[in-house]
A protein has these predicted regions:
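A conserved beta-strand-loop-helix scaffold within acyl/acetyltransferase catalytic domains
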Residues: 1-99
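Conserved GNAT acetyl-CoA-binding A-motif
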Residues: 91-93, 121-135
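Short conserved micro-motifs at the rims of enzyme active sites and ligand-binding pockets
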Residues: 69-71, 105-108, 142
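Conserved acetyl-CoA-binding loop of GNAT-fold acetyltransferases
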Residues: 123, 143-154
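Conserved beta-strand-loop-alpha-helix junction that forms the acyl-donor binding cleft
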Residues: 100-105, 131-141
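Conserved acetyl-CoA-binding loop-helix of GNAT-fold acetyltransferases
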Residues: 78, 92-101, 105-121
Length: 163
C-alpha cells in the first residue's frame, strides 16, 4: 500500500504543479525506510475506491515549530524534551501532503476527504492546521475557500533569465 501511495502521489502532481519532480524508485524506498514508520496513523488519511486503489490521501504531523523555538533551535542538552512533548500535543498540525488520484480529481472527493480529516484532527484535539506553501496557480488549492481561514504568509518566486 505504501508504494501505491507514492505512485498515486507522483500521478496526482506530475504535470499539474510547476517544477514538480516525481519520486524515483530509490527515493521511494528511502522514504519508506526513514519516514513512513514515524507517521502517526491518527493524522493520516487514505481513501480507497472500489478497486482497492488509492482515491485520495493526506498526511499531517504535529507542528514542531514552537518546540524548536523553546529549545533555542537545539536538541541538546534539553531541547529533545520539548520536541518529544510536541509530538504528543496536537494543538497545531502541519499539513504535509494532500492529493487525489487523477481519475478522482474534480469529482467532489475533496469534500469527503477534508471532512474525514477535519474529524480526525478534532478527535486528536487539534485546533489549528497549517498548510505548507502552495503555488498560487495551483487551482486545486481552492478547496480552502470553504473553510474559515486566514492567509498569513505568501511566498513568490520570480524567474529571470540571466544573459
Amino acid at each position: 500500500m505504501v508504494r501505491s501511495f507514492f505512485r498515486t502521489y507522483n500521478e496526482c502532481y506530475d504535470g499539474k504543479v510547476y517544477n514538480f519532480v516525481p519520486f524515483t524508485k530509490e527515493e521511494i524506498e528511502e522514504e519508506i525506510d526513514q519516514v513512513m514508520g514515524q507517521l502517526d496513523k491518527r493524522l493520516c488519511c487514505v481513501l480507497m475506491d472500489s478497486d482497492n486503489e488509492i482515491a485520495a490521501f493526506g498526511v499531517a504531523i504535529p507542528s514542531l515549530s514552537k518546540a524548536m523555538q523553546k529549545a533555542g533551535g537545539s536538541l541538546f542538552p534539553f531541547g529533545w524534551y520539548h520536541v518529544l512533548k510536541a509530538l504528543t500535543d496536537f494543538t497545531y498540525l502541519d499539513l504535509m501532503l494532500e492529493g487525489a488520484a487523477p481519475k478522482w480529481q474534480n469529482t467532489g472527493i475533496s469534500a469527503v476527504f477534508h471532512g474525514m480529516m477535519a474529524q480526525q484532527f478534532q478527535d486528536c484535539g487539534a485546533r489549528w492546521a497549517l498548510a505548507n506553501p502552495q503555488i498560487e496557480t495551483n487551482t486545486a488549492v481552492n478547496v480552502w475557500g470553504r473553510y474559515e481561514h486566514e492567509l498569513w504568509r505568501r511566498r513568490r518566486c520570480w524567474i529571470r533569465k540571466i544573459k
